[in-house]
Amino acid sequence: MATVAEQWVLVEMVQALYEAPAYHLILEGILILWIIRLVFSKTYKLQERSDLTAKEKEELIEEWQPEPLVPPVSKNHPALNYNIVSGPPTHNIVVNGKECVNFASFNFLGLLANPRVKATAFSSLKKYGVGTCGPRGFYGTFDVHLDLEERLAKFMKTEEAIIYSYGFSTIASAIPAYSKRGDIIFVDSAACFAIQKGLQASRSDIKLFKHNDVADLERLLKEQEIEDQKNPRKARVTRRFIVVEGLYMNTGTICPLPELVKLKYKYKARIFLEESLSFGVLGEHGRGVTEHYGISIDDIDLISANMENALASVGGFCCGRSFVVDHQRLSGQGYCFSASLPPLLAAAAIEALNIMEENPDIFAVLKKKCQNIHKSLQGVSGLKVVGESLSPALHLQLEESTGSREKDVKLLQAIVDQCMDKGIALTQARYLDKEEKCLPPPSIRVVVTVEQTEEELQRAASTIREAAQAVLL
């Protein structure tokens, strides 16, 4: 039976060959010949070799110009013209040998040179030494780390907290710990560089909405909702995150958190709140933007902040529910693979928290000074104030750009230099121009601290006004 079947198949093939159109047979024949040629032909052809004479070799060597090891850099680049600070960057700072009032460092609560903080750090140094020489999971966890995490969780009124040894890596590690490829992140276009690096590491689908524009965010959420309805199976495994800052580093503006919380529950998203600038600043007790708006901490899925501003230490922390925070102990890259925070800095942060809890009036003092400098800087010729009146970090931008970013930077730097000559230390906001997703305009950053007196605030405002008139008019 098998032989008969094989003969029948052969007969059908021959019959099909006779019935096939001529062009079909020609095409198949060409393809067969092409395949045979590809199989037996060589992948390359040997070219006739032509040896160069010694004279020709020497001429080629003399003509050859090597590429520079590094790209050419302008002599006016800020990295090549840095200021040298002598001593701690406290209320009064010595820059290039000249003593100035510090309006550049983020020492909001003036704790950097606080005697209690320094004494605690010295005591911890004698007990633990300088560093830990290992990550938290490899003999890098000291009792003072656990104490600090407990204190931070208690202060923020959350279940648990986790600390990182570097402020920048905190949010940059937290985002990719939860959001992976295939997930969707809705992020404010003015997000700081640390958030941008976290987004990049997550490999998630990033959707930017206009700065503090709740309507634009809802538009994106609605579009995603429509997409989810088309593919409900995929939607069930896709996580959605909203990433914002409490006070934006690049603009000094506050996020509309109440409206964001409403959108969170309406569209079933999770909120990550970066509070490096608002922690220790906003709220009656310095707990940040949630306390400022009176929003329950449970409405926020994860809060992140660094300890390098208000706490005048180093590192950062995340806080929230225990099951959320514990996930970072296994998935937070900066937590798992970096040496843990030096114990002396953890002890200093604990003492800074003690001072914040003992002196809650300090936040009202800072708020008043922020409002005063914000008001005093209004109407400066050629400059506009960008930022909320309650933000301790304001931006001064040119009212009208020259059309060239390089020229704008030079004009603002001339104002900074004149202020420095008159004893007011300021700085321009610096960015990695080629790596920023949405590059902010050039600006001068003015930082307010509780240590600055009213007379110094007014002096700074008048000095900036005079420098702007001299440079821009």
Swiss-Prot record:
<dbReference type="GO" id="GO:0004758">
    <property type="term" value="F:serine C-palmitoyltransferase activity"/>
</dbReference>
<keyword id="KW-1133">Transmembrane helix</keyword>
<dbReference type="GO" id="GO:0006665">
    <property type="term" value="P:sphingolipid metabolic process"/>
</dbReference>
<feature type="transmembrane region" description="Helical">
    <location>
        <begin position="16"/>
        <end position="36"/>
    </location>
</feature>
<protein>
    <recommendedName>
        <fullName>Serine palmitoyltransferase 1</fullName>
        <ecNumber>2.3.1.50</ecNumber>
    </recommendedName>
</protein>
<keyword id="KW-0663">Pyridoxal phosphate</keyword>
<dbReference type="InterPro" id="IPR015422">
    <property type="entry name" value="PyrdxlP-dep_Trfase_small"/>
</dbReference>
<dbReference type="GO" id="GO:0030148">
    <property type="term" value="P:sphingolipid biosynthetic process"/>
</dbReference>
<dbReference type="InterPro" id="IPR050087">
    <property type="entry name" value="AON_synthase_class-II"/>
</dbReference>
<comment type="similarity">
    <text>Belongs to the class-II pyridoxal-phosphate-dependent aminotransferase family.</text>
</comment>
<dbReference type="GO" id="GO:0005789">
    <property type="term" value="C:endoplasmic reticulum membrane"/>
</dbReference>
<keyword id="KW-0256">Endoplasmic reticulum</keyword>
<dbReference type="InterPro" id="IPR004839">
    <property type="entry name" value="Aminotransferase_I/II_large"/>
</dbReference>
<feature type="topological domain" description="Cytoplasmic">
    <location>
        <begin position="37"/>
        <end position="473"/>
    </location>
</feature>
<dbReference type="GO" id="GO:0046513">
    <property type="term" value="P:ceramide biosynthetic process"/>
</dbReference>
<dbReference type="GO" id="GO:0017059">
    <property type="term" value="C:serine palmitoyltransferase complex"/>
</dbReference>
<feature type="topological domain" description="Lumenal">
    <location>
        <begin position="1"/>
        <end position="15"/>
    </location>
</feature>
<dbReference type="GO" id="GO:0046511">
    <property type="term" value="P:sphinganine biosynthetic process"/>
</dbReference>
<comment type="pathway">
    <text>Lipid metabolism; sphingolipid metabolism.</text>
</comment>
<keyword id="KW-0746">Sphingolipid metabolism</keyword>
<comment type="function">
    <text>Component of the serine palmitoyltransferase multisubunit enzyme (SPT) that catalyzes the initial and rate-limiting step in sphingolipid biosynthesis by condensing L-serine and activated acyl-CoA (most commonly palmitoyl-CoA) to form long-chain bases. The SPT complex is also composed of SPTLC2 or SPTLC3 and SPTSSA or SPTSSB. Within this complex, the heterodimer with SPTLC2 or SPTLC3 forms the catalytic core. The composition of the serine palmitoyltransferase (SPT) complex determines the substrate preference.</text>
</comment>
<dbReference type="GO" id="GO:0030170">
    <property type="term" value="F:pyridoxal phosphate binding"/>
</dbReference>
<dbReference type="InterPro" id="IPR015424">
    <property type="entry name" value="PyrdxlP-dep_Trfase"/>
</dbReference>
<feature type="region of interest" description="Interaction with SPTLC2">
    <location>
        <begin position="1"/>
        <end position="66"/>
    </location>
</feature>
<dbReference type="InterPro" id="IPR015421">
    <property type="entry name" value="PyrdxlP-dep_Trfase_major"/>
</dbReference>
<dbReference type="GO" id="GO:1904504">
    <property type="term" value="P:positive regulation of lipophagy"/>
</dbReference>
<feature type="modified residue" description="Phosphotyrosine; by ABL">
    <location>
        <position position="164"/>
    </location>
</feature>
<dbReference type="Pfam" id="PF00155">
    <property type="entry name" value="Aminotran_1_2"/>
</dbReference>
<keyword id="KW-0012">Acyltransferase</keyword>
<keyword id="KW-0597">Phosphoprotein</keyword>
<dbReference type="GO" id="GO:0046512">
    <property type="term" value="P:sphingosine biosynthetic process"/>
</dbReference>
<keyword id="KW-0472">Membrane</keyword>
<dbReference type="GO" id="GO:0006686">
    <property type="term" value="P:sphingomyelin biosynthetic process"/>
</dbReference>
<comment type="subunit">
    <text>Component of the serine palmitoyltransferase (SPT) complex, which is also composed of SPTLC2 or SPTLC3 and SPTSSA or SPTSSB. The heterodimer with SPTLC2 or SPTLC3 forms the catalytic core of the enzyme, while SPTSSA or SPTSSB subunits determine substrate specificity. SPT also interacts with ORMDL proteins, especially ORMDL3, which negatively regulate SPT activity in the presence of ceramides. Forms dimers of heterodimers with SPTLC2. Interacts with RTN4 (isoform B).</text>
</comment>
<dbReference type="GO" id="GO:0061724">
    <property type="term" value="P:lipophagy"/>
</dbReference>
<dbReference type="GO" id="GO:1904649">
    <property type="term" value="P:regulation of fat cell apoptotic process"/>
</dbReference>
<keyword id="KW-0812">Transmembrane</keyword>
<keyword id="KW-0808">Transferase</keyword>
<keyword id="KW-0443">Lipid metabolism</keyword>
